[in-house]
C-alpha cells in the first residue's frame, strides 16, 4: 500500500439511482443519484462510500469536489456555509485521526480556492482548467497564495475539457461547452506556433 497514493473526492454523496443517458453534464454516467453535501456528516458519508468502493480504509488525499459558483451558481452560498460550519473541521479531525493523509479542493475556479485559503490551511488544491495554454488565470493570485501557505497545486483539465487535445475542430469543447469563435481562433494561433 505504501507504493501508491489513493485519492478520492467528497462533496457528492452517491446512492442507487436509475440508469440515465446524461446527468450533471456526464454522458452515460453510472446509475447513481447525486446529492451535494459539504457538511461534516456529508463528507464522512461520501468518504465511507469511497472507502467501500476502493476497498481501503486509508485515503492518502481527499479533495472537496466542485465547491464553488462554477458548479453551484447562486446555491454555492449554502454549500460554502455548510463547509465552513462543519466540513472543514471534519477534514481536520479525519487527518488528525490518521484516516486521511491530506485534504484540499478539487475545483474548476480560482476564487473558491482563495476564499477557502482565507478560512484555513489546505494541503493541496487540484485545479482544473485554470493554468493551461488557453487560461492562465491562476498564474498570479492563486499561485502566490499557494506558495505563501505551503499548499501543493495539482493541475487537472490541462486540455480545457478537450480542445487542446483535439485542436480547433468541429465539435471541440472548452470548459465542458462548445468552444466559442474566440477560443477556436486562439487555438488556431497556438497550432500555428507549434508548427513553426
Language-model regions, residue ranges each:
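N-terminal binding-site loop/beta-alpha segment at the start of enzyme catalytic domains
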Residues: 1-16, 25
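Short acidic capping loops at alpha-helix termini that bridge into adjacent secondary structure
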Residues: 2-4, 57-61, 101-102, 123-124
Amino acid at each position: 500500500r505504501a507504493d501508491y497514493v489513493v485519492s478520492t473526492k467528497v462533496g457528492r454523496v452517491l446512492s442507487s439511482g436509475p440508469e440515465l443517458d446524461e446527468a450533471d453534464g456526464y454522458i452515460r454516467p453510472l446509475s447513481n443519484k447525486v446529492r451535494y453535501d459539504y457538511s461534516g456528516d456529508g463528507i464522512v458519508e461520501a468518504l465511507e462510500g469511497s472507502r467501500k468502493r476502493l476497498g481501503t480504509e486509508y485515503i492518502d488525499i481527499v479533495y472537496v469536489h466542485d465547491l464553488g459558483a462554477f458548479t453551484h451558481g447562486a446555491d454555492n452560498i449554502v454549500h460554502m456555509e455548510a463547509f465552513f460550519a462543519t466540513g472543514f473541521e471534519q477534514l481536520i479531525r479525519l487527518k488528525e485521526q490518521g484516516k486521511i493523509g491530506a485534504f484540499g479542493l478539487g475545483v474548476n475556479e480560482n476564487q473558491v480556492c482563495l476564499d477557502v485559503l482565507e478560512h484555513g490551511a489546505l494541503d493541496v488544491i487540484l485545479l482544473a482548467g485554470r493554468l493551461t495554454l488557453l487560461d492562465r488565470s491562476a498564474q498570479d493570485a492563486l499561485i502566490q497564495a499557494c506558495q505563501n501557505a505551503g499548499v501543493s497545486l495539482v493541475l487537472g483539465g490541462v486540455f480545457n475539457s478537450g480542445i487542446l487535445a483535439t485542436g480547433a475542430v468541429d465539435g471541440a469543447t472548452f470548459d465542458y461547452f462548445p468552444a466559442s469563435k474566440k477560443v477556436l481562433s486562439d487555438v488556431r494561433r497556438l497550432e500555428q506556433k507549434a508548427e513553426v
